[in-house]
Amino acid sequence: MMIKYLFATLLLFAGFTPLQAQTVSDPNAPYLKDNKIPPFSITSIDGKEVTNKQMPKYAFTCIIIFSPDCPHCEKEAGEINKYADKFKNVLFIWDSYRDMESIKKFAVKYNLVDKPNVIIGRDPNFTLPTFYRPRMTPFVALYQKGVLLKVYEQGADVFELIKIIEGK
């Protein structure tokens, strides 16, 4: 009887191991070897192509790979929008692999439309997902003057972002 409980316990813990492993960075992800913003081209929700060379200059750049139907992504967008006044010196690049209509609905819902410091759309060449190899969304990469500061594999804590941006 005791062996059955021990075996069941081992199976239970073994079942959780793959879930924990999914949150660890892919050791071959290119961003681990290159700390600069990668070359990319995003089709924004207004149909314009935006590349890394054309993006507006801000002190910080925050690249977020998201899915419009992801609850954690919705929370992230809501928090960033709630504290938008703290992020005036940050360019947000929201990239999704989903269809443009879903991305537009997300942008409207979370007030990400017509903001000078927000680019939201789709990377048709999957350059950003290939560079970061996110295991889940939202995946957040924060840069200062084009150099990688920090990566958040499971979404960023807005208050931590604010502290970094404010230099605290």
State where each predicted segment sits.
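Bacterial Sec-dependent N-terminal signal peptides
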Residues: 1-27, 168
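N-terminal "domain-start" segment that seeds a small globular fold
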Residues: 22-53
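A short helix-to-beta-strand connector/capping loop
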Residues: 38, 88, 114-118
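Short active-site neighborhood of thiol/selenol oxidoreductases, capturing the structured segment around
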Residues: 52-74, 80
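Structural recognition of the beta-strand scaffold that forms the well-ordered cores
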Residues: 64, 93-95, 119
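Structural microenvironment flanking redox-active thiols in thiol-disulfide oxidoreductases
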Residues: 74-111, 127-130
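Short, internal strand/loop/helix patches
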Residues: 110-141
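Thiol-/selenol-based redox modules, centered on thioredoxin-like
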Residues: 143-168
